[in-house]
Design a protein with these regions (language model features):
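Conserved anion-binding
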Residues: 102-161, 165-177
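Alpha-helix-loop-beta-strand connector modules within alpha/beta enzyme cores
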Residues: 52-76, 115-135, 158-163, 186-206
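Hydrophobic faces of well-ordered beta-strands that scaffold small-molecule active sites
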Residues: 5-13, 40-44, 72-78, 95-97, ...
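N-terminal small/glycine-rich loop or linker at the start of catalytic domains
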Residues: 1-19, 96-109, 132-147, 189-201
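Catalytic alpha/beta core domains of metabolic enzymes, predominantly
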Residues: 175-245
Length: 245
């Protein structure tokens, strides 16, 4: 398959990078305008601590009020069991659960070790039983960590294997959180993952940033490796509030 699905993530990744609070009404208007562009999937926000990311504290209200085409798939991000509860209560049926590969970034992001975050995910996911939503597991810092530098590919592979063991039907987003990934690194990691793990039940997505003007080049390398789901954000907005530099 040569078609590429572009996921519009500006309402989550983009908005969270904007410091002045955006009025809920303005967010709704922008999201409806983005939906009119013809995307098939949109990441509308996140259910996380409002103290950590106040910009997205109104995600539930946005979901209630926004008017979107029936064909548009809506996904929302969570990072723990509490976020999962909030998302499910808000009617979210497509979930993005994020865990960092690097210990330092995961602690900065959710104040837990990687193992603690994964155990929380495994427990919460198993507890849903048949009421599970569609799942994307977002692995942050797959290439670079602001504190630890280059992330070993083996570390990513281990978490991919753990993800598949817990959720055999899953989309796994391989994320270049800082935008420091090089094209050869992207090609190498995705080549390894696609050859070994890609299947009709396990798909991979690429989430990158254009910090060093390599966003498009890296996306092309992911495509060459077989990836057909790529995140994008209107206006190039985006960035992790917990990743300095």
């Amino acid at each position: 398959m040569n078609d590429v699905e572009i996921i519009e993530v500006a309402p989550r990744d983009g908005f969270q990078a904007v410091k002045p609070l955006i009025a809920t009404e303005r967010k709704i208007a922008l999201i409806e305008e983005l939906a009119a562009c013809g995307f098939r999937r949109l990441e509308i926000g996140s259910f996380v601590s409002p103290k950590a990311i106040p910009q997205l504290a109104d995600t539930g209200e946005v979901l209630r009020r926004v008017r979107l085409p029936a064909h548009l798939r809506i996904q929302a991000l969570v990072a723990n069991a509490r976020g999962l509860e909030m998302a499910m209560a808000a009617g979210v049926r497509e979930l993005v659960w994020v865990i960092s590969v690097s210990e330092s970034h995961n602690r900065a992001n959710v104040n837990r070790s990687v193992d603690e975050s994964f155990k929380a995910f495994e427990t919460a996911w198993a507890g849903l039983g048949r009421d599970r939503p569609w799942l994307r597991l977002g692995l942050s810092t797959c290439f670079d960590c602001p504190w630890e530098g280059r992330v070993p590919e083996d570390n990513v592979v281990r978490l991919v294997e753990r993800t598949i063991a817990a959720a055999p039907e899953v989309e796994i987003a391989i994320c270049d959180t800082t935008g420091r990934a090089s094209p050869d690194h992207v090609g190498s990691l995705f080549g390894r993952l696609m050859r070994r793990y890609a299947s009709p039940k396990v798909t991979f997505a690429y989430h990158g940033h254009d910090t060093y003007n390599l966003g498009v080049t890296n996306a092309i390398e992911a495509y060459k490796a077989g990836v057909r789901v790529i995140d994008g954000a209107a206006g190039g907005l985006g960035g992790c509030p917990f990743a300095p530099g």
